[in-house]
């Protein structure tokens, strides 16, 4: 048996007449497949709004079951509220009679209806037997979707019908728990009525059920069932409808499969059982499609499943609200029986319809919908010739298809679109992208079903003046500006990563491949420390190789696989590539497939970007240290971490080593309290970027003392002149007095010479406030004949760029050789030149007699840290083991003194050792060549790095120097040391550092024929990469612990940063190293910088964070390891 209930039906009553009825429009829900009925031959015309009316009835009226018209626009009729004591008003449709009304008084009708209700069956499982209709039967228009539920009827016609239906019901194998009879009254004007219970006069169609004691029809339950479950019916094609002009056009009902054949009553009305079956219709449609696969869908009439043009212009969808005591049974628009409209009976909703459906609350409608057909090159059958039972929540609905039960998707009025004659084209959002460009990325629900092409235009990136692309505006307000590289943002891949998006087969089983470990871990590093979990991925993503990412319509699946929220700090390189791929960065729109594609693409780009030499260096560190780098830390564990865990003997550390570590920590803290707080060189350069290229240019000459046979250095030429006696000028005069000492640190050893090859060196001046100035010197013999004393050309600048000023000194030397008067105009034009940005070139116009006007181009390199560094000289003077000890002493900011015979050796080795500290900068006193007259500086209690000539060594030994490391560069030995230099660094990292430096020649030769970066193939590049990797291993995770305060300021989480490291030896090293001013200046620089270009270290850090594996132990392994540590500790104590 079948049962349907319509919530959008029209009530039409009228007096007799045989005119063809006018159709009424509504939406209906169905709980079972409706019968397939033949279309009427009479023309069907839709009603206009003026012809439609509706009546409202009280919810407590049990004697009359009526439904209002959903399309009524008559406010006067809608506002009526008749009392239960009076007969309900009758809705008329002009003069046209729609149904036959009983002429008995309304009181008689109510009495008959009460008798009908008494024997009704309460439960609804199956649904109503519908009687055949004549050709002129009303409600059979193609656009009609409603049938009247009424309890009115006459005793005259009901007796014979009761006998016939009783005979038909007697042939059933099982009696349904409840039946609902749609009855057709014979007469000039026919009327449909549905009554409950067998003893009713109005509907003697069903045998009473044992559970028919209740007298009230539960229309609420019927609403709930009809809203929840539905089996859709599919009307016949137009060809079949046209093929039946001569047949009897009675509509007939076909029962569900598994039930008995139609009753004798249906046969009595001339119904053909076999030809009208749903199965036969389906078979014919399938056969027609198989014979002509290219023909596509059969063209449906304009009145099928929708209103025609005249109606569509004025009609609106009915609302979902309905009086409590009303219900309806509706025929399918094409089938004409008691059934709902098929789910695919109509084109996909337009943009407005889709938006209104998304805004619908889950409580409004939980209407099911059909699954989309399997993807195939041929267009899908519309209607699909195979009904399916589905259930979906409202949030899961696909707005591209109509609800299968025909209910309006939302209470918002909207005109249903007509059914197109051809399949709908793929939906593209390109023309509308400007209309919704203002929407925020968090509000992505309306973009769930976008195609990839529209997503690629959501976040267009704009080129900046540097030639790179600016980061789009994402949901989070702040990003990690320190990752704004100028040199690593690559081009967009030519291939489209969304070419293989499967738009239809979204419910098929996922043929998955697991996200690679590196790609998945790279996503971990993009999260904030609070969100990041090192123990497991956020979800075990089951990812398809062919990404079907962006049109996954099942929102409940997406919610169950939701990723953790991305942090405010994204890697700029990741975000730039995401912008290029047009992937949104909001959590609701990054699903697993897009992450798979993006992560693999990111890792592949970065693996290509890492030079082979760097990969070999990294492999050495990985082999020595292992895979585990960071451990899982929650905020509670950071606060309650015990000292026992910090100092447990898990790495064979002895008590003596722990005591030495504690003493070292106390020593560096006490020493740094006495040292002034210096600022980083980078911050100083930021303040001077708008100033001149250099501060002073001086010429220093040796003058003989009158009383002695010795020479003293003096400034013989100065540019510019210090005219105004301001405070800055007085400080500049003090510096000028010290400059000659650094230009001639060995002045007492000089005598006039006839020949001398020019020598270039540099020094650094550190002010009381920590400001630094570089001195670039060229020592040479002036023009003339005979023995003479050399002189030094010196340029004082805040810019640390040795190559640029070497070119300036070459030009000065050339002009000085012609005439000293030519130096002044050149230096003036140079001072008026702008301060060059990294990688930029400035042009200086000069005039030279005999050569005319000239243009001198001065280029500042992108990275000048290795420009004036010669590691070859450093390895010539020192062994690898000695160099690592010196490096460790400098990291802990100890006092270091170099001693050498030559000025150039001291200068080269001092600058090279400081360059090993990159990305950190030495914050304390740094004098590559200390004049003998200033040797007392080595007695100061603060850290320093100074170089002394061998002639000053006897005096040095007499001075009361505190703890310091004295290195003789000529003999490769330590003059004085502290005996713990081998234990300052983590032992595994120290072993990797030593091995990589020992194999430097082998590593360079392996890459000599490769096409990798030329900079890395040099000795300077290799040594720099080896030490950079050391810092990456120790502090490379610092960016994960830079948080933003409410004011937008950055703050570094020191304890969380240190305790996140898995290795205890590295944690102990960090505990001391984090007290240094080098580390403080490094973090301060990262906290204060806004948007600046990054160097090599940030690139290597990003690559390192992608390599981090997920190695958090399980609870049992952690327990066993802790137990082993305790046993070892007790064993050592005993």
Swiss-Prot record:
Residues 1-90, 233-273, 289-571, 633-658 are annotated as: Disordered. GO terms for molecular function: guanyl-nucleotide exchange factor activity. GO terms for biological process: positive regulation of ERK1 and ERK2 cascade. It comes from the Eukaryota. Residues 249-259, 389-399 have a biased composition (Basic and acidic residues). The modification Phosphothreonine is found at residues 228, 361, 479. Residues 1000-1093 form the dDENN domain. Residues 315-348 have a biased composition (Low complexity). The keyword Cell inner membrane does not apply. It is found in: Cytoplasm, Cell cortex; Cell membrane; Recycling endosome. Its main location: cytoplasm. This is DENN domain-containing protein 2B. It comes from Mus musculus (Mouse). The gene is Dennd2b.
């Amino acid at each position: 048996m079948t049962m349907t209930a319509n919530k959008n039906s029209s009530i039409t009553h009228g007096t007799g007449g045989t005119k063809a009825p006018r159709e009424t429009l509504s939406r209906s829900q169905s709980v079972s497949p409706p019968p397939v009925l033949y279309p009427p031959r009479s023309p069907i015309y839709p009603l206009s709004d003026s012809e439609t009316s509706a009546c409202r009835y009280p919810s407590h009226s049990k004697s009359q079951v009526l439904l209002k018209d959903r399309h009524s626009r008559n406010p006067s009729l809608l506002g009526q509220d008749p009392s239960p004591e009076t007969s309900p008003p009758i809705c008329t449709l002009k003069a046209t009679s729609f149904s036959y009304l009983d002429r008995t008084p309304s009181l008689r009708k109510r009495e008959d209806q009460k008798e009908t209700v008494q024997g009704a069956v309460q439960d609804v499982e199956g649904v109503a037997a519908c009687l055949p209709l004549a050709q002129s039967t009303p409600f059979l228009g193609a656009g009609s979707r409603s049938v009247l539920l009424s309890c009115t009827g006459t005793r005259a016609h009901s007796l014979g019908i009761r006998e016939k239906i009783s005979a038909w019901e007697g042939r059933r194998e099982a009696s349904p728990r409840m039946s609902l009879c749609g009855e057709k009254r014979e007469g000039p004007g026919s009327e449909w009525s549905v009554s409950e219970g067998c003893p009713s006069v109005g509907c003697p169609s069903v045998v009473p059920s044992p559970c028919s004691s209740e007298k009230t029809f539960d229309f609420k339950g019927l609403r709930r069932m009809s809203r929840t479950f539905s089996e859709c019916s599919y009307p016949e094609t137009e060809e079949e409808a046209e093929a039946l002009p001569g047949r009897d056009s009675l509509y007939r009902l076909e029962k569900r499969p598994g039930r008995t054949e139609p009753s004798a009553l249906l046969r009595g009305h001339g119904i053909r059982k076999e030809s009208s079956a749903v199965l036969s219709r389906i078979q014919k449609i399938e056969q027609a499609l198989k014979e002509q696969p290219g023909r596509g869908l059969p063209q449906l009439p304009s009145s099928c499943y929708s209103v025609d043009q005249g109606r569509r212009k004025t009609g609106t969808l009915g609302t979902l609200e309905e009086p409590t005591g009303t219900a309806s049974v509706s025929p399918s628009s094409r089938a004409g029986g008691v059934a709902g409209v098929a789910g695919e009976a109509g084109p996909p909703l337009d943009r407005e319809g889709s938006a209104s459906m998304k805004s619908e609350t889950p409580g409004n409608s939980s209407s099911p919908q059909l699954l989309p057909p399997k993807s195939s090159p041929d267009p899908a059958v519309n209607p699909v010739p195979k009904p399916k039972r589905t259930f979906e929540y409202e949030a899961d609905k696909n707005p591209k298809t109509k609800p299968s039960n025909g209910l309006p998707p939302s209470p918002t009025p909207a005109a249903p679109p007509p059914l197109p004659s051809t399949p709908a084209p793929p939906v593209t959002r390109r023309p509308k992208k400007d209309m919704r460009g203002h929407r925020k990325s968090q509000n992505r629900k309306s973009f769930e079903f976008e195609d990839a092409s529209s997503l690629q235009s959501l976040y267009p990136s704009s080129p900046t003046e540097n030639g790179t692309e600016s980061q789009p505006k994402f949901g989070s307000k702040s990003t990690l500006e320190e990752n704004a590289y100028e040199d690593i943002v690559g081009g967009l891949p030519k291939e489209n990563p969304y070419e293989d998006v499967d738009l239809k087969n979204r419910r098929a089983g996922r043929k998955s491949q697991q996200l690679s470990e590196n790609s998945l871990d790279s996503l971990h590093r993009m999260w904030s420390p609070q969100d990041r979990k090192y123990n497991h991925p956020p979800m075990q993503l089951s990812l398809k190789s062919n990404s079907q990412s962006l049109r996954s319509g099942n929102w409940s699946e997406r919610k169950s696989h939701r990723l953790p929220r991305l942090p405010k700090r994204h890697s700029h390189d990741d975000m730039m590539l995401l912008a290029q791929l047009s992937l949104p960065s909001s959590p609701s729109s990054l699903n697993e497939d897009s992450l798979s594609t993006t992560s693999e693409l990111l890792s592949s780009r970065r693996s290509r970007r890492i030079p082979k030499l760097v990969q070999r260096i990294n492999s050495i560190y990985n082999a020595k240290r292992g895979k585990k780098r960071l451990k899982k830390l929650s905020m509670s564990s950071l606060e309650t971490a015990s000292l026992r865990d910090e100092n447990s003997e898990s790495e064979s550390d002895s008590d003596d080593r722990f005591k030495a570590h504690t003493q070292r920590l106390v020593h560096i803290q006490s020493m740094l309290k006495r040292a002034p707080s210096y600022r980083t060189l980078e911050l100083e350069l930021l303040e001077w970027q708008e100033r001149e290229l250099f501060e002073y240019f001086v010429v220093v000459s040796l003058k003989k003392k009158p009383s002695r046979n010795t020479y003293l250095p003096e400034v013989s030429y100065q540019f510019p002149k210090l005219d105004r006696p301001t405070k800055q000028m007085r400080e500049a005069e003090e510096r000028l007095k010290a400059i000659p000492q650094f230009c001639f640190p060995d002045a007492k050893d000089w005598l006039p010479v006839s020949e001398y090859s020019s020598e270039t060196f540099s020094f650094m001046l550190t002010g009381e406030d920590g400001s630094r100035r570089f001195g670039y010197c060229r020592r040479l013999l002036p023009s003339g004949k005979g023995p003479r004393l050399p002189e030094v050309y010196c340029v004082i600048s805040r810019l640390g760029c040795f190559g640029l000023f070497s070119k300036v000194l070459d030009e000065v030397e050339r002009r000085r050789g012609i005439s000293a008067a030519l130096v002044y105009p050149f230096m003036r034009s140079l001072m008026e030149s702008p301060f060059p940005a990294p990688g930029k070139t400035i042009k200086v116009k000069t005039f030279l007699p005999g050569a005319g006007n000239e243009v001198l181009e001065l280029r500042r390199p992108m990275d000048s840290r290795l420009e004036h560094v010669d590691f070859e000289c450093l390895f010539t003077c020192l062994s690898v083991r000695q160099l690592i000890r010196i490096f460790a002493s400098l990291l802990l900011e100890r006092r270091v003194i170099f001693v050498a015979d030559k000025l150039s050796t001291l200068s080269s080795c001092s600058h090279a050792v400081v360059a090993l500290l990159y990305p950190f900068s030495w914050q304390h006193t740094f004098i590559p060549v200390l004049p003998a007259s200033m040797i007392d500086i080595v007695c100061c209690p603060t850290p320093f790095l100074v170089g002394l000539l061998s002639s000053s060594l006897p005096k040095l030994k007499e001075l009361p120097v505190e703890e310091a490391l004295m290195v003789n560069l000529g003999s490769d030995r330590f003059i004085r040391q502290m005996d713990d230099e081998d234990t300052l660094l983590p032992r595994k990292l120290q072993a990797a550092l030593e091995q990589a430096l020992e194999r430097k020649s082998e590593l360079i030769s392996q890459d000599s024929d490769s096409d990798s970066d030329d900079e890395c193939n040099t000795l300077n590049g290799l040594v720099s990469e080896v030490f950079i990797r050391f810092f990456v291993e120790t502090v490379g995770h610092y960016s994960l612990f830079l948080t933003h305060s409410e004011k937008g300021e950055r703050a570094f989480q020191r304890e969380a940063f240190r305790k996140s490291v898995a290795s205890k030896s590295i944690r102990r090293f960090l505990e001391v190293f984090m007290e240094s001013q080098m580390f403080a200046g490094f973090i301060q620089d990262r906290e204060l910088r806004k948007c600046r270009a990054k160097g090599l270290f940030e690139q290597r850090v990003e690559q390192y964070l992608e390599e981090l594996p997920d190695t958090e132990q399980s609870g049992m392994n952690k327990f066993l390891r802790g137990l082993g540590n305790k046993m070892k500790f007790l064993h050592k104590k005993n």
